UniProtKB/Swiss-Prot annotation:
Species for this entry: Muraenesox cinereus (Daggertooth pike conger)
PROSITE patterns membership: GLYCO_HORMONE_BETA_1, GLYCO_HORMONE_BETA_2
Protein encoded by which gene: cgb
Entry function: Involved in gametogenesis and steroidogenesis.
Alphabetically ordered keywords of this record: Disulfide bond, Glycoprotein, Hormone, Secreted
Superkingdom: Eukaryota
Cystine pairs: 6-54, 20-69, 23-107, 31-85, 35-87, 90-97
Name listed for the protein in its UniProt record: Gonadotropin subunit beta
Keyword Secreted: yes
GO cellular component terms attached to this protein's record: cytoplasm; extracellular space
Length: 113
């Protein structure tokens, strides 16, 4: 099969937060695809290997409102929408850099209808 390049794709994701009993599932644009990486056969303790991952380059932010949140809980959740993507180092502050993670549409709580 042909490896897809790093690019924005449409994906179903979920958002949820403490104090809101329901998870909201919807379509948005995320970065996905393959980046060329190198893994040297000789690893020196003095060398550092950097793996590049498919990550956001340009984004816009959108906000959704979660239903049935408790009084005093802000029902709004803001998330990035991928406009363009790039193969770059993974930034833990903004990206899921785990080797294995949950599906983007996984909900811990009940899904909102």
């Amino acid at each position: 099969s042909v490896l897809q390049p790093c690019q924005p794709i449409n994906e179903t994701i979920s958002v949820e937060k403490d104090g809101c009993p329901k998870c909201l599932v919807f379509q948005t644009s995320i970065c996905s695809g393959h980046c060329i990486t190198k893994d040297p056969s000789y690893k020196s303790p003095l060398s550092t290997v950097y793996q590049r991952v498919c990550t956001y380059r340009d984004v816009r932010y959108e906000t959704v409102r979660l239903p049935d949140c408790r009084p005093g809980v802000d029902p709004h959740v803001t998330f990035p929408v991928a406009l363009s993507c790039d193969c770059n180092l993974c930034t833990m502050d903004t990206s899921d850099c785990a080797i294995q993670s949950l599906r983007p549409d996984f909900c811990m709580s009940q899904r909102a209808p």
